[in-house]
Protein backbone atom coordinates (compact mmCIF):
# COMPACT_ATOMS: atom_id res chain seq x y z
CA UNK A 1 0.00 0.00 0.00
CA UNK A 2 1.25 3.44 -0.92
CA UNK A 3 1.68 5.41 2.28
CA UNK A 4 3.37 8.59 1.07
CA UNK A 5 0.64 10.84 2.42
CA UNK A 6 1.32 13.79 4.64
CA UNK A 7 0.60 13.09 8.30
CA UNK A 8 -0.30 16.50 9.64
CA UNK A 9 -3.27 17.23 11.89
CA UNK A 10 -5.22 18.84 9.12
CA UNK A 11 -4.38 16.03 6.77
CA UNK A 12 -5.41 13.47 9.30
CA UNK A 13 -8.66 15.32 9.81
CA UNK A 14 -9.37 15.40 6.11
CA UNK A 15 -8.47 11.79 5.85
CA UNK A 16 -10.75 10.92 8.67
CA UNK A 17 -13.62 12.74 7.03
CA UNK A 18 -13.06 10.94 3.78
CA UNK A 19 -12.96 7.63 5.55
CA UNK A 20 -16.23 8.36 7.34
CA UNK A 21 -17.89 9.26 4.08
CA UNK A 22 -16.61 6.08 2.59
CA UNK A 23 -18.05 4.07 5.42
CA UNK A 24 -21.42 5.72 5.00
CA UNK A 25 -21.47 4.86 1.35
CA UNK A 26 -20.64 1.29 2.11
CA UNK A 27 -23.42 1.06 4.66
CA UNK A 28 -25.91 2.35 2.17
CA UNK A 29 -24.71 -0.13 -0.38
CA UNK A 30 -25.05 -2.97 2.03
CA UNK A 31 -28.60 -1.97 2.94
CA UNK A 32 -29.62 -1.71 -0.67
CA UNK A 33 -28.05 -5.05 -1.43
CA UNK A 34 -29.93 -6.71 1.39
CA UNK A 35 -33.30 -5.33 0.33
CA UNK A 36 -32.71 -6.41 -3.21
CA UNK A 37 -31.84 -9.89 -2.13
CA UNK A 38 -35.04 -10.23 -0.11
CA UNK A 39 -37.26 -9.12 -2.97
CA UNK A 40 -35.56 -11.47 -5.32
CA UNK A 41 -36.12 -14.31 -2.97
CA UNK A 42 -39.87 -13.57 -2.72
CA UNK A 43 -40.30 -13.47 -6.46
CA UNK A 44 -39.57 -16.93 -7.68
CA UNK A 45 -39.31 -17.81 -11.33
CA UNK A 46 -41.95 -20.52 -10.91
CA UNK A 47 -44.85 -18.17 -10.92
CA UNK A 48 -43.78 -17.17 -14.38
CA UNK A 49 -43.62 -13.52 -13.98
CA UNK A 50 -41.10 -10.94 -13.07
CA UNK A 51 -41.84 -8.54 -10.38
CA UNK A 52 -40.70 -5.00 -10.86
CA UNK A 53 -39.88 -3.82 -7.40
CA UNK A 54 -38.61 -0.45 -6.41
CA UNK A 55 -35.20 -1.89 -5.74
CA UNK A 56 -34.76 -3.21 -9.20
CA UNK A 57 -31.80 -2.03 -11.18
CA UNK A 58 -34.00 -0.38 -13.70
CA UNK A 59 -35.77 1.65 -11.06
CA UNK A 60 -32.90 2.50 -8.67
CA UNK A 61 -31.24 5.83 -9.56
CA UNK A 62 -29.05 6.25 -6.42
CA UNK A 63 -26.72 3.35 -7.03
CA UNK A 64 -23.03 4.23 -6.20
CA UNK A 65 -20.56 2.42 -8.42
CA UNK A 66 -16.77 2.52 -7.76
CA UNK A 67 -14.81 4.76 -10.12
CA UNK A 68 -12.81 3.06 -12.77
CA UNK A 69 -9.07 2.67 -12.30
CA UNK A 70 -8.24 4.76 -15.33
CA UNK A 71 -9.66 7.83 -13.62
CA UNK A 72 -7.41 7.44 -10.54
CA UNK A 73 -5.74 10.80 -9.72
CA UNK A 74 -2.11 11.01 -8.60
CA UNK A 75 -1.95 13.47 -5.74
CA UNK A 76 1.09 15.61 -4.97
CA UNK A 77 2.10 14.92 -1.38
CA UNK A 78 2.86 18.63 -0.84
CA UNK A 79 -0.55 19.81 -1.98
CA UNK A 80 -2.20 19.05 1.33
CA UNK A 81 0.16 21.27 3.35
CA UNK A 82 0.70 23.88 0.63
CA UNK A 83 -1.77 26.34 2.12
CA UNK A 84 -0.11 26.07 5.52
CA UNK A 85 3.34 26.97 4.07
CA UNK A 86 2.50 30.07 2.13
CA UNK A 87 4.04 32.36 4.79
CA UNK A 88 7.32 30.35 4.79
CA UNK A 89 10.20 30.60 2.24
CA UNK A 90 9.99 28.04 -0.52
CA UNK A 91 12.71 25.42 -0.05
CA UNK A 92 12.41 22.72 -2.61
CA UNK A 93 13.61 19.24 -1.87
CA UNK A 94 16.77 18.11 -3.72
CA UNK A 95 14.96 14.94 -4.80
CA UNK A 96 11.87 16.71 -6.06
CA UNK A 97 12.45 16.05 -9.73
CA UNK A 98 14.07 12.64 -9.28
CA UNK A 99 12.25 9.88 -11.06
CA UNK A 100 11.40 7.24 -8.54
CA UNK A 101 9.29 4.14 -8.77
CA UNK A 102 7.29 3.47 -5.60
CA UNK A 103 7.92 0.22 -3.86
CA UNK A 104 4.54 -1.39 -3.93
CA UNK A 105 5.67 -4.36 -1.87
CA UNK A 106 7.38 -2.28 0.80
CA UNK A 107 5.84 -2.64 4.26
CA UNK A 108 8.54 -0.78 6.24
CA UNK A 109 7.97 2.54 7.90
CA UNK A 110 9.34 5.54 5.97
CA UNK A 111 9.54 9.20 6.83
CA UNK A 112 8.06 11.59 4.37
CA UNK A 113 9.93 14.55 2.85
CA UNK A 114 8.80 17.13 5.40
CA UNK A 115 9.84 15.01 8.34
CA UNK A 116 13.22 14.22 6.77
CA UNK A 117 13.87 17.89 6.08
CA UNK A 118 13.13 18.75 9.67
CA UNK A 119 15.07 15.88 11.21
CA UNK A 120 18.11 16.12 8.92
CA UNK A 121 18.21 19.46 7.09
CA UNK A 122 20.63 20.06 4.21
CA UNK A 123 23.18 22.95 4.01
CA UNK A 124 21.76 25.31 1.43
CA UNK A 125 23.66 28.62 0.95
CA UNK A 126 21.42 31.66 1.00
CA UNK A 127 21.46 34.28 -1.73
CA UNK A 128 23.95 37.17 -1.72
CA UNK A 129 21.26 39.81 -1.55
CA UNK A 130 20.42 38.75 1.97
CA UNK A 131 23.74 40.14 3.27
CA UNK A 132 23.76 43.51 1.47
CA UNK A 133 23.53 46.18 4.10
CA UNK A 134 22.65 49.73 3.17
CA UNK A 135 25.11 52.34 4.64
CA UNK A 136 23.97 54.69 7.32
CA UNK A 137 24.64 58.31 6.26
CA UNK A 138 24.79 59.62 9.82
CA UNK A 139 27.46 57.14 10.91
CA UNK A 140 29.46 57.70 7.73
CA UNK A 141 29.57 61.47 8.28
CA UNK A 142 30.71 61.05 11.88
CA UNK A 143 33.52 58.69 10.87
CA UNK A 144 34.77 61.06 8.15
CA UNK A 145 34.88 63.99 10.56
CA UNK A 146 36.92 61.97 13.04
CA UNK A 147 39.42 60.89 10.37
CA UNK A 148 39.97 64.42 9.02
CA UNK A 149 40.42 65.86 12.51
CA UNK A 150 43.06 63.23 13.34
CA UNK A 151 45.23 63.90 10.29
CA UNK A 152 44.92 67.68 10.61
CA UNK A 153 45.88 67.99 14.24
CA UNK A 154 48.65 65.37 14.60
CA UNK A 155 51.86 65.11 12.39
CA UNK A 156 52.59 61.58 11.40
CA UNK A 157 55.59 62.14 8.98
CA UNK A 158 57.36 65.55 8.63
CA UNK A 159 57.55 67.05 5.17
CA UNK A 160 61.01 66.68 3.47
CA UNK A 161 60.79 70.17 1.93
CA UNK A 162 61.35 71.96 5.22
CA UNK A 163 64.00 69.49 6.37
CA UNK A 164 66.93 71.41 7.95
CA UNK A 165 69.43 68.78 6.81
CA UNK A 166 69.11 69.92 3.21
CA UNK A 167 70.74 73.25 4.02
CA UNK A 168 73.93 71.52 5.18
CA UNK A 169 76.19 70.43 2.34
CA UNK A 170 78.96 67.92 2.74
CA UNK A 171 82.28 69.34 1.47
CA UNK A 172 84.70 66.69 0.26
CA UNK A 173 88.48 67.12 -0.15
CA UNK A 174 88.62 70.35 1.83
CA UNK A 175 92.32 69.97 2.67
CA UNK A 176 94.67 72.91 2.22
CA UNK A 177 97.06 70.99 -0.02
CA UNK A 178 94.54 70.51 -2.82
CA UNK A 179 94.22 73.17 -5.48
CA UNK A 180 90.86 74.89 -6.03
CA UNK A 181 88.62 73.89 -8.88
CA UNK A 182 89.30 77.11 -10.79
CA UNK A 183 92.99 76.23 -11.01
CA UNK A 184 93.35 73.99 -14.03
CA UNK A 185 96.92 72.91 -13.38
CA UNK A 186 97.72 69.29 -14.13
CA UNK A 187 97.84 66.93 -11.19
CA UNK A 188 100.94 64.79 -11.04
CA UNK A 189 100.25 61.12 -10.51
CA UNK A 190 102.59 58.19 -10.35
CA UNK A 191 102.04 55.74 -13.19
CA UNK A 192 102.98 52.79 -11.01
CA UNK A 193 100.15 53.40 -8.53
CA UNK A 194 96.90 51.65 -9.41
CA UNK A 195 94.85 52.54 -6.32
CA UNK A 196 94.77 55.93 -4.63
CA UNK A 197 93.57 56.24 -1.05
CA UNK A 198 92.12 59.61 -0.09
CA UNK A 199 91.62 60.33 3.61
CA UNK A 200 89.86 63.29 5.23
CA UNK A 201 92.04 65.88 6.99
CA UNK A 202 90.67 65.00 10.43
CA UNK A 203 90.99 61.33 11.36
CA UNK A 204 90.03 59.46 14.51
CA UNK A 205 92.71 59.28 17.15
CA UNK A 206 93.18 55.53 16.91
CA UNK A 207 93.48 55.57 13.12
CA UNK A 208 95.89 58.49 13.20
CA UNK A 209 98.14 56.74 15.72
CA UNK A 210 98.08 53.58 13.61
CA UNK A 211 99.01 55.39 10.38
CA UNK A 212 101.55 57.81 11.84
CA UNK A 213 104.64 55.58 11.51
CA UNK A 214 103.84 54.98 7.83
CA UNK A 215 103.46 58.64 6.81
CA UNK A 216 106.69 60.52 6.06
CA UNK A 217 105.88 63.99 4.67
CA UNK A 218 109.55 65.00 4.22
CA UNK A 219 110.19 62.09 1.88
CA UNK A 220 106.96 62.83 0.05
CA UNK A 221 108.12 66.39 -0.62
CA UNK A 222 111.42 65.16 -2.07
CA UNK A 223 109.65 62.68 -4.28
CA UNK A 224 107.20 65.29 -5.51
CA UNK A 225 110.04 67.70 -6.32
CA UNK A 226 111.92 64.97 -8.14
CA UNK A 227 108.82 64.08 -10.15
CA UNK A 228 108.31 67.71 -11.09
CA UNK A 229 111.93 68.08 -12.17
CA UNK A 230 111.77 64.95 -14.32
CA UNK A 231 110.52 65.89 -17.75
CA UNK A 232 109.25 64.09 -20.78
CA UNK A 233 111.90 61.32 -21.14
CA UNK A 234 110.95 59.63 -17.86
CA UNK A 235 107.28 59.74 -18.68
CA UNK A 236 107.99 58.53 -22.20
CA UNK A 237 110.09 55.59 -21.01
CA UNK A 238 107.65 54.58 -18.28
CA UNK A 239 104.60 54.53 -20.54
CA UNK A 240 102.93 51.62 -22.25
CA UNK A 241 105.25 51.93 -25.27
CA UNK A 242 107.78 49.76 -23.48
CA UNK A 243 105.36 46.88 -23.72
CA UNK A 244 104.62 47.49 -27.38
CA UNK A 245 108.11 48.21 -28.74
CA UNK A 246 111.68 47.44 -27.80
CA UNK A 247 112.96 50.95 -27.08
CA UNK A 248 116.46 50.14 -25.86
CA UNK A 249 117.96 52.04 -28.81
CA UNK A 250 115.51 54.96 -28.81
CA UNK A 251 116.64 58.31 -27.45
CA UNK A 252 114.05 61.03 -26.83
CA UNK A 253 115.41 64.49 -27.51
CA UNK A 254 113.97 67.52 -25.78
CA UNK A 255 112.87 70.74 -27.42
CA UNK A 256 116.34 72.25 -27.04
CA UNK A 257 118.15 69.26 -28.58
CA UNK A 258 116.60 69.56 -32.04
CA UNK A 259 119.85 70.83 -33.61
CA UNK A 260 121.80 67.73 -32.55
CA UNK A 261 122.45 65.45 -35.56
CA UNK A 262 120.91 62.02 -35.20
CA UNK A 263 122.61 58.75 -36.00
CA UNK A 264 119.98 57.01 -38.05
CA UNK A 265 116.85 59.06 -38.64
CA UNK A 266 115.15 62.12 -37.21
CA UNK A 267 111.34 62.30 -37.25
CA UNK A 268 109.85 65.72 -36.61
CA UNK A 269 106.63 66.04 -34.63
CA UNK A 270 104.20 68.97 -34.28
CA UNK A 271 105.17 69.39 -30.63
CA UNK A 272 108.76 70.15 -31.55
CA UNK A 273 110.11 66.98 -29.91
CA UNK A 274 112.25 64.65 -31.99
CA UNK A 275 112.84 60.93 -31.57
CA UNK A 276 116.14 59.42 -32.68
CA UNK A 277 116.29 55.72 -33.58
CA UNK A 278 119.81 54.47 -33.04
CA UNK A 279 120.32 51.55 -35.41
CA UNK A 280 117.37 49.22 -35.90
CA UNK A 281 114.24 49.18 -33.79
CA UNK A 282 115.35 46.07 -31.96
CA UNK A 283 118.99 44.97 -31.86
CA UNK A 284 118.73 41.46 -30.50
CA UNK A 285 121.57 39.07 -29.89
CA UNK A 286 120.86 37.16 -33.08
CA UNK A 287 121.26 40.29 -35.19
CA UNK A 288 117.73 40.09 -36.65
CA UNK A 289 115.47 43.07 -36.11
CA UNK A 290 111.78 42.81 -35.33
CA UNK A 291 110.86 44.72 -38.46
CA UNK A 292 113.89 44.13 -40.67
CA UNK A 293 112.74 40.70 -41.83
CA UNK A 294 109.51 42.20 -43.11
CA UNK A 295 110.98 45.19 -44.92
CA UNK A 296 112.99 45.02 -48.17
CA UNK A 297 115.32 47.66 -46.73
CA UNK A 298 117.71 45.45 -44.77
CA UNK A 299 119.90 48.25 -43.47
CA UNK A 300 120.78 51.80 -44.29
CA UNK A 301 124.44 51.36 -45.19
CA UNK A 302 123.99 49.37 -48.40
CA UNK A 303 125.60 46.28 -46.82
CA UNK A 304 124.44 42.68 -46.69
CA UNK A 305 122.00 41.89 -43.87
CA UNK A 306 124.58 40.12 -41.72
CA UNK A 307 127.27 42.83 -41.89
CA UNK A 308 127.59 44.82 -38.64
CA UNK A 309 127.61 48.59 -38.65
CA UNK A 310 131.17 49.72 -37.84
CA UNK A 311 130.45 53.44 -38.11
CA UNK A 312 131.79 54.04 -41.63
CA UNK A 313 128.40 54.98 -43.02
CA UNK A 314 127.28 57.04 -40.05
CA UNK A 315 129.55 59.93 -41.02
CA UNK A 316 128.09 60.07 -44.51
CA UNK A 317 124.57 60.01 -43.10
CA UNK A 318 125.33 62.75 -40.59
CA UNK A 319 126.92 65.01 -43.18
CA UNK A 320 124.18 64.39 -45.72
CA UNK A 321 121.39 65.12 -43.26
CA UNK A 322 123.23 68.14 -41.91
CA UNK A 323 123.67 69.56 -45.41
CA UNK A 324 120.21 68.74 -46.72
CA UNK A 325 118.26 69.45 -43.49
CA UNK A 326 115.56 66.98 -44.43
CA UNK A 327 112.07 68.03 -43.35
CA UNK A 328 109.11 65.75 -42.60
CA UNK A 329 108.68 62.71 -44.92
CA UNK A 330 105.80 64.32 -46.84
CA UNK A 331 107.31 67.74 -47.32
CA UNK A 332 106.87 69.67 -50.62
CA UNK A 333 109.64 69.12 -53.14
CA UNK A 334 110.06 72.84 -53.84
CA UNK A 335 111.48 73.59 -50.39
CA UNK A 336 113.97 70.77 -50.70
CA UNK A 337 115.08 71.88 -54.16
CA UNK A 338 115.70 75.42 -52.90
CA UNK A 339 117.90 74.12 -50.12
CA UNK A 340 119.75 71.82 -52.47
CA UNK A 341 120.86 74.81 -54.64
CA UNK A 342 123.31 75.86 -51.93
CA UNK A 343 124.17 72.44 -50.56
CA UNK A 344 124.82 70.18 -53.57
CA UNK A 345 127.81 72.21 -54.79
CA UNK A 346 129.78 71.45 -51.60
CA UNK A 347 129.27 67.67 -51.66
CA UNK A 348 132.63 65.94 -52.15
CA UNK A 349 133.47 62.71 -53.97
CA UNK A 350 133.36 60.66 -50.78
CA UNK A 351 129.80 61.79 -50.13
CA UNK A 352 128.59 60.69 -53.57
CA UNK A 353 128.44 56.93 -52.90
CA UNK A 354 125.06 56.90 -51.14
CA UNK A 355 122.67 54.65 -52.93
CA UNK A 356 119.05 55.21 -53.73
CA UNK A 357 118.07 52.84 -50.96
CA UNK A 358 119.73 55.14 -48.39
CA UNK A 359 117.94 58.18 -49.76
CA UNK A 360 114.61 56.38 -49.69
CA UNK A 361 115.18 54.93 -46.24
CA UNK A 362 115.93 58.37 -44.82
CA UNK A 363 112.49 59.58 -45.82
CA UNK A 364 110.26 57.09 -44.06
CA UNK A 365 110.53 54.67 -41.19
CA UNK A 366 111.85 51.15 -41.91
CA UNK A 367 108.46 49.56 -42.21
CA UNK A 368 106.94 47.36 -44.90
CA UNK A 369 107.31 48.77 -48.40
CA UNK A 370 103.61 48.26 -49.05
CA UNK A 371 102.63 51.10 -46.73
CA UNK A 372 100.03 53.66 -47.89
CA UNK A 373 102.78 56.30 -48.13
CA UNK A 374 104.86 54.22 -50.51
CA UNK A 375 103.26 55.41 -53.74
CA UNK A 376 103.39 59.08 -52.83
CA UNK A 377 106.99 58.80 -51.65
CA UNK A 378 108.04 57.12 -54.89
CA UNK A 379 106.64 59.93 -57.05
CA UNK A 380 108.05 62.60 -54.73
CA UNK A 381 111.47 60.90 -54.84
CA UNK A 382 111.39 60.88 -58.64
CA UNK A 383 110.60 64.58 -58.89
CA UNK A 384 113.12 65.51 -56.18
CA UNK A 385 115.89 63.40 -57.69
CA UNK A 386 115.26 64.84 -61.15
CA UNK A 387 115.49 68.40 -59.88
CA UNK A 388 118.60 67.57 -57.85
CA UNK A 389 120.26 66.23 -60.99
CA UNK A 390 119.40 69.34 -62.99
CA UNK A 391 120.62 71.63 -60.23
CA UNK A 392 123.85 69.67 -59.97
CA UNK A 393 124.54 69.97 -63.69
CA UNK A 394 123.76 73.69 -63.70
CA UNK A 395 125.80 74.36 -60.58
CA UNK A 396 128.74 72.42 -62.02
CA UNK A 397 128.59 74.47 -65.18
CA UNK A 398 128.46 77.70 -63.20
CA UNK A 399 131.43 76.69 -61.10
CA UNK A 400 133.45 75.78 -64.19
CA UNK A 401 132.59 79.06 -65.93
CA UNK A 402 133.41 81.17 -62.86
CA UNK A 403 136.66 79.41 -62.13
CA UNK A 404 137.71 79.02 -65.78
CA UNK A 405 140.13 81.96 -65.69
CA UNK A 406 141.70 81.14 -62.32
CA UNK A 407 143.61 77.83 -62.10
CA UNK A 408 142.56 75.99 -58.94
CA UNK A 409 144.85 73.00 -59.30
CA UNK A 410 147.29 71.43 -61.75
CA UNK A 411 146.49 68.22 -63.55
CA UNK A 412 148.97 65.70 -64.90
CA UNK A 413 148.57 63.09 -67.56
CA UNK A 414 148.19 60.36 -64.96
CA UNK A 415 145.38 62.25 -63.29
CA UNK A 416 143.66 62.74 -66.65
CA UNK A 417 143.80 59.01 -67.29
CA UNK A 418 142.41 58.35 -63.83
CA UNK A 419 139.63 60.88 -64.47
CA UNK A 420 138.75 59.18 -67.74
CA UNK A 421 138.66 55.78 -66.02
CA UNK A 422 136.47 57.25 -63.29
CA UNK A 423 134.17 58.68 -65.94
CA UNK A 424 133.85 55.24 -67.51
CA UNK A 425 133.03 53.72 -64.14
CA UNK A 426 130.52 56.47 -63.50
CA UNK A 427 128.85 55.78 -66.85
CA UNK A 428 128.56 52.07 -66.01
CA UNK A 429 127.22 52.88 -62.57
CA UNK A 430 124.78 55.36 -64.12
CA UNK A 431 123.45 52.68 -66.47
CA UNK A 432 123.05 50.14 -63.66
CA UNK A 433 121.38 52.67 -61.36
CA UNK A 434 119.01 53.74 -64.12
CA UNK A 435 118.06 50.12 -64.83
CA UNK A 436 117.59 49.34 -61.14
CA UNK A 437 115.54 52.47 -60.52
CA UNK A 438 113.33 51.78 -63.52
CA UNK A 439 112.86 48.19 -62.32
CA UNK A 440 111.72 49.45 -58.95
CA UNK A 441 109.45 52.07 -60.47
CA UNK A 442 107.92 49.58 -62.91
CA UNK A 443 106.92 47.21 -60.09
CA UNK A 444 103.63 48.89 -59.40
CA UNK A 445 100.42 47.30 -58.26
CA UNK A 446 98.88 47.19 -61.75
CA UNK A 447 100.67 46.64 -65.13
CA UNK A 448 99.10 49.72 -66.71
CA UNK A 449 101.21 51.94 -68.97
CA UNK A 450 104.06 49.44 -69.42
CA UNK A 451 104.92 50.76 -72.85
CA UNK A 452 104.84 54.33 -71.59
CA UNK A 453 107.32 53.44 -68.82
CA UNK A 454 109.66 51.79 -71.32
CA UNK A 455 109.67 54.83 -73.58
CA UNK A 456 110.30 57.08 -70.58
CA UNK A 457 113.22 54.87 -69.52
CA UNK A 458 114.80 55.15 -72.95
CA UNK A 459 114.46 58.93 -72.95
CA UNK A 460 115.89 59.07 -69.45
CA UNK A 461 118.90 56.98 -70.46
CA UNK A 462 119.62 59.12 -73.53
CA UNK A 463 119.27 62.37 -71.59
CA UNK A 464 121.57 61.12 -68.84
CA UNK A 465 124.25 60.17 -71.40
CA UNK A 466 124.00 63.56 -73.15
CA UNK A 467 124.15 65.43 -69.84
CA UNK A 468 127.18 63.42 -68.78
CA UNK A 469 128.97 64.14 -72.06
CA UNK A 470 128.22 67.86 -71.80
CA UNK A 471 129.53 67.90 -68.26
CA UNK A 472 132.77 66.16 -69.28
CA UNK A 473 133.20 68.54 -72.21
CA UNK A 474 132.79 71.58 -69.96
CA UNK A 475 135.26 70.19 -67.45
CA UNK A 476 137.89 69.48 -70.10
CA UNK A 477 137.45 72.91 -71.68
CA UNK A 478 137.84 74.63 -68.32
CA UNK A 479 140.97 72.63 -67.51
CA UNK A 480 142.53 73.32 -70.92
CA UNK A 481 141.95 77.05 -70.62
CA UNK A 482 143.79 77.18 -67.31
CA UNK A 483 146.74 74.81 -67.94
CA UNK A 484 147.40 73.75 -71.56
CA UNK A 485 145.42 72.60 -74.59
CA UNK A 486 144.37 69.03 -74.17
CA UNK A 487 143.26 66.40 -76.58
CA UNK A 488 139.66 66.41 -77.79
CA UNK A 489 137.38 64.55 -75.39
CA UNK A 490 136.86 61.01 -76.42
CA UNK A 491 133.38 59.56 -76.03
CA UNK A 492 133.58 56.78 -73.49
CA UNK A 493 131.12 54.11 -74.48
CA UNK A 494 129.73 52.09 -71.60
CA UNK A 495 131.34 48.70 -71.40
CA UNK A 496 128.85 45.91 -71.43
CA UNK A 497 129.84 43.51 -68.72
CA UNK A 498 128.22 40.26 -67.76
CA UNK A 499 124.48 40.64 -68.09
CA UNK A 500 122.78 40.46 -64.74
CA UNK A 501 119.38 38.74 -64.88
CA UNK A 502 116.62 40.94 -63.48
CA UNK A 503 113.62 39.05 -62.24
CA UNK A 504 110.94 39.79 -59.72
CA UNK A 505 111.32 38.08 -56.40
CA UNK A 506 108.03 39.24 -54.90
CA UNK A 507 104.42 38.50 -55.74
CA UNK A 508 104.09 41.57 -57.98
CA UNK A 509 102.06 43.66 -55.53
CA UNK A 510 104.90 45.32 -53.62
CA UNK A 511 105.90 48.75 -54.71
CA UNK A 512 109.65 48.11 -54.43
CA UNK A 513 111.46 45.06 -55.78
CA UNK A 514 114.23 43.26 -53.99
CA UNK A 515 116.42 43.40 -57.12
CA UNK A 516 116.64 47.17 -56.78
CA UNK A 517 118.35 46.93 -53.44
CA UNK A 518 120.59 44.13 -54.63
CA UNK A 519 122.26 46.57 -57.02
CA UNK A 520 122.38 49.28 -54.40
CA UNK A 521 124.05 46.99 -51.89
CA UNK A 522 126.62 45.45 -54.21
CA UNK A 523 127.75 48.50 -56.21
CA UNK A 524 128.61 51.98 -54.84
CA UNK A 525 126.67 54.35 -57.08
CA UNK A 526 127.05 58.06 -57.65
CA UNK A 527 124.48 60.41 -56.13
CA UNK A 528 123.99 62.30 -59.37
CA UNK A 529 123.65 59.08 -61.34
CA UNK A 530 121.24 57.50 -58.87
CA UNK A 531 119.04 60.58 -58.98
CA UNK A 532 118.30 60.13 -62.68
CA UNK A 533 114.61 59.71 -63.26
CA UNK A 534 112.01 60.11 -65.94
CA UNK A 535 111.58 63.48 -67.70
CA UNK A 536 109.66 66.20 -65.96
CA UNK A 537 106.23 64.96 -66.95
CA UNK A 538 104.96 64.33 -63.42
CA UNK A 539 106.30 67.52 -61.81
Curated annotation (Swiss-Prot):
Any GO CC annotation of this UniProt entry: cytoplasm
Biased composition (Acidic residues): 408-428
Keyword Kinase: no
InterPro entries: Aurora_borealis_protein (IPR023252)
Entry PTM: Phosphorylated by aur.
Assigned keywords, A-Z: Cell cycle, Cell division, Cytoplasm, Mitosis, Nucleus, Phosphoprotein
Molecular-function GO terms, alphabetical: protein kinase binding
Highest taxon above the source species: Eukaryota
Low complexity compositional bias, start-end: 32-43, 433-444
Subcellular compartments: Cytoplasm; Nucleus
Region (Disordered): 23-70, 398-499
Modification sites for Phosphoserine: 383
GO biological process terms, semicolon-separated: activation of protein kinase activity; asymmetric protein localization involved in cell fate determination; cell division; regulation of mitotic nuclear division; regulation of mitotic spindle organization
Pfam families in UniProt: BORA_N
Chief location bin: cytoplasm
Skewed-composition ranges (Polar residues): 44-63, 458-467
Quaternary structure and interacting proteins, as annotated: Interacts with aur.
Family affiliation: Belongs to the BORA family.
Biological role stated in the UniProt entry: Required for the activation of Aurora-A (aur) at the onset of mitosis.
Protein name according to UniProt: Protein aurora borealis
Gene: bora
Amino acid sequence: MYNDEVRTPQALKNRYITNVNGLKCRARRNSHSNSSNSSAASATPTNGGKENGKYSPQMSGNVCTPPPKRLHKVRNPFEGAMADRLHLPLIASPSLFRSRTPQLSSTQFEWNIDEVSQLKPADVEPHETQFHDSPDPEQESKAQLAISAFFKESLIVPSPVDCPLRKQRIILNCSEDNTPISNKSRRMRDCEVQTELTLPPILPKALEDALRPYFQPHLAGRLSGRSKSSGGPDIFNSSMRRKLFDLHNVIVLGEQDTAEPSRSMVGSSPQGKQTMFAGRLSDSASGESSFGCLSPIRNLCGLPPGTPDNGTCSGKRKLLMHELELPSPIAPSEHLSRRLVHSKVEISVTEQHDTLSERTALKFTPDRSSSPMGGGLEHSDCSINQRVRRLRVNSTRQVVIETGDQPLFEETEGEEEEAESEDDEEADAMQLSTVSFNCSSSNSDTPRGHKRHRSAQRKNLSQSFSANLEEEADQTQGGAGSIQPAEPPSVAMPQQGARIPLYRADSGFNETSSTTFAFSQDLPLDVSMACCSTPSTRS
